Amino acid sequence: MLVQKLLSSKRIEAYRATLALAIPLIGSNIAHSVKHLTDTIMLGRYSVDALAAGVLGATIFVFLMITGSGFSIAVISLASNAEGSHKSWMVRRYIRMGCWITILYCFVMLIPMWFSQPIFLLMGQDPAISELAADYLLYAMWGLFPALILMVFKAFFLALVRPKIIFVSTLIGALFNIFANYLLIFGNFGFPELGVRGAAIASTVSHSLALLIMLAFLIRVRDFLPYKLFSNFLSFHSSSFREIFNLGWPICAAMIAEASFFSGAAIMMGWINTASLAAHGIVIEICAMVFMIYYGLSYAGTTQISSALGRNDPVEIKTISNAILELNLMAACVVITIFLLFPEALISVFLKEDTAETREVLDIGMKILLFAAFFQLFDAFQAVLLGFLRGLKDTLIPMIIAAISYWVVGITTSYFLAFNVGLDGEGVYGGFIIGLGFASILFFFRFRRKLSKLGSGDGSSLV
C-alpha cells in the first residue's frame, strides 16, 4: 500500500515539481555557504587577527542578514499565493513593498554596524580585534542592502517557478567573491593589500553583482515584462506593506530564536573547554552545510503550498506536503548514514596537524557528531514543516513554538545534561535532540490542524 502511494503518478509528479524547485535552491544555498567558508579560509591564511576579526564582524553581519530575511520569506508566501490566484498586480505590489520594508530595515541596521566597536568592547572582546572587526563592518554593512533586496527578488523567481536564475546569480556572486578576496585581502596582481577590509569590500561587491544579474534577468526576459515590477516603484501601498510586516516579523523572531539557540550552545561548549568549542565549530559547520538540503526543500514547500493555497486546492497541498516530507526523510537518512559510518573522515578534513590538541578535538568531534546524526531527522522535519506553515501564512504561533522549543526546552536541557548530569559536549547536543524534536512534533500537529481547517480531512494521511 505504501509503495503504491509512493509510486502513484500524482506523487511522482509532486516529487518532480519539488525537486525542480529545490535542487537549484539547494545549490544556491551551498554556494552561499561556500562563500562564507572561503572568506574564513583566506582570512586565516592572511593572519590570525584578521581571521578573528573577520569571524566576529561576519557573525554580526550574517545575524542581521538572517533576521532581515524573514520579511523576504513573507514575500515568498504572499507573492506565490498571488501568482497561484492569477493576480499579477498583487505580485508586483508585494515585491515593491518587500523592497521598501527591506530598505527601511537595512537603514536601521546601519546604526549598530556603524557603532560596532564600542558594542564589541562592551561584549568583552579584545580591543585590537574589536577595531579590526568594526573596520570590517564599516565596509560590509553596505552589502546588506543588495543581499536582502536580492532575497526579495528571489521571492518573485520562486513565485514564477524560475529557481535556476537564483542559482546562477548566487553562484556567479560566490565565485566572484573568491576571486575578489584573492585580489583584495592579499594584494595580488597590483591590487592594494587590504586584509579584513578587502574581505568586506569583496563581500559587498559580490552581493551587488548577484543583484545586478537578477535585475538583468528581470529586465531582459520577456516572460517577466507583463508583471511591470518597476512600474510605479516609488508608490506606497499600505495594506501590502502591513501584510508583509505582520507575516514577516514573527518569521524574523523565530529565526533569531533558532540562531541564538545554536549560539547559546557554542557559549556552553566554550565553558567546558577550548577543545570542545573547536569540535563544536567543526560539527556545526558540517551540519550547516547539510542543512542547506532541508532549507531548500523548506523554501520549495513554502512556494508550492502558497501557490496551491492561492488556487484554493487543499488536496494539492496535502500531496505536495507528503512528497516533500518523503524526500526530506530520504535525505535525512542518507545524511545520518554518512555521519554514523564516517565520523573520523568528516572531522579530519578540518584538522591539519596530528598533535595532542587536534587528537582531543577529533575525539570530541566524533562523539558529538554521532549525536548530530540523531538530531538530523528532527532538524530536517522542523525546517520543512515550518516552511509549510509559512506557506499557509501561519507565522505567529510557530514563532511561539520555536521560542519555547529552542530556549525553554532545548537550551535548558543542554545545560542540565552538560553540567548537572556531567555529559559535557554530548549533553549539549542531547539538548539539540530534545529541543528540535519538540519543535518538529509541535509543528507537525500545527500543520495537521491548519490542513484540516482547509477541508482536506483530518490530515491523518500525512507521513
Locations of the language-model features?
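Helix-terminus/linker motif at the lipid-water interface of multi-pass membrane proteins
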Residues: 30, 34-52, 120-127, 183-194, ...
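N-terminal transmembrane alpha-helices
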Residues: 9-41, 45-46, 59-74, 78, ...
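Interfacial/gating helices of multi-pass transporter permease domains
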Residues: 20, 43-62, 94, 128-132, ...
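Short alpha-helical transmembrane segments in multi-pass integral membrane proteins
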Residues: 1-22, 79-145, 193-249, 305-374, ...
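Generic alpha-helical transmembrane segments of integral inner-membrane proteins
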Residues: 26, 30, 34, 63, ...
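Transmembrane helical elements of multi-pass membrane transporters/channels
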Residues: 20-39, 139, 173, 206-210, ...
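Short runs within selected transmembrane alpha-helices of multi-pass transporters and secretion channels
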Residues: 72, 140-158, 166-174, 199-215, ...
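Small-residue-rich hydrophobic transmembrane alpha-helices
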Residues: 51-110, 114, 147-161, 165-166, ...
